[in-house]
């Protein structure tokens, strides 16, 4: 399928910026995309028309509630969530993961095990390592082949024990571009009664993402990887989110998703 490349480029004001008379080239584009004019306009309108705390009994607060509710509905459609209540917004994926690790950790006991991967971005590694240190958990590492840059799921089968409580894995590697078979990994986790946490920051921009088909318990992504604002999004299975005790101040909502 062909498309008008010039028309697409025209949607991104940042592509018209020049330095010393030459068009700017964004070599860091994989780390974060530029936003289309429509996104910048929507963000500007939000700041001008609905810049207020949520949950208030006045017009700008009601408008802010509507913006957030609409955004949750949009992300729920993108990820095929069963409910917009399963969508949580945060500063970025790293911050969300660090925050959620504090809540998930309350489910575990000293001596429990978690499985991490050295293929993953540190945002899906270090929060869990810190959690493990604080709670006296054992970290087990899922290796990958240095030839194929893929996981051998037989290795995962050997790592799973009756003490395993959590598996954290990336949907796609930001280093090698490997698309991991997260559906099979999450199926093994589910069969063993283990929670699964998928870092889909690099995969959501490139492949259709269906959390129901993947079968994970949590999935995180970053809208600024696909032309949105610099923010993080967590999808969590509603019944699992409702089991967690969120880290929050007392005035914050008590119900999911606002409690997170």
Regions found by a protein language model. Give the residues of each.
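Pyridoxal 5′-phosphate
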Residues: 1-260
């Amino acid at each position: 399928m062909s498309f008008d490349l010039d028309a697409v480029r025209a949607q991104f004001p940042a592509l018209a910026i020049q330095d010393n008379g030459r068009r700017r080239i964004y070599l860091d584009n994989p780390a974060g995309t530029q936003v289309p004019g429509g996104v910048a306009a929507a963000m500007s309108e939000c700041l001008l028309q609905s810049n207020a705390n949520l949950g208030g009994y006045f017009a700008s607060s009601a408008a802010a509630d509507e913006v957030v509710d609409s955004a949750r509905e949009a992300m729920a459609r993108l990820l095929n969530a069963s409910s917009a209540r399963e969508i949580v917004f945060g500063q970025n994926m790293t911050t969300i993961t660090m925050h959620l690790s504090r809540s998930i950790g309350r489910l575990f006991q000293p001596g429990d095990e978690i499985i991490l991967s050295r293929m993953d971005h540190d945002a899906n590694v270090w929060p869990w390592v810190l959690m493990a240190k604080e709670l006296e958990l054992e970290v087990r590492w899922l290796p990958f082949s240095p030839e194929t840059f893929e996981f051998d799921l037989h290795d995962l089968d050997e790592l799973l024990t009756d003490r395993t409580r959590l598996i954290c894995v990336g949907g796609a590697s930001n280093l090698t571009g490997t698309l991991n078979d997260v559906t099979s990994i999450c199926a093994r986790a589910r069969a063993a009664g283990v929670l699964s946490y998928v870092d889909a920051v690099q995969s959501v921009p490139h492949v259709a993402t269906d959390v129901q088909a993947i079968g994970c318990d949590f999935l995180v992504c970053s809208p600024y990887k696909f032309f949105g604002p610099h923010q993080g999004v967590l999808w969590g299975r509603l019944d699992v989110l409702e089991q967690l005790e969120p880290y929050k101040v007392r005035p914050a909502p008590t119900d999911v998703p606002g409690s997170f």
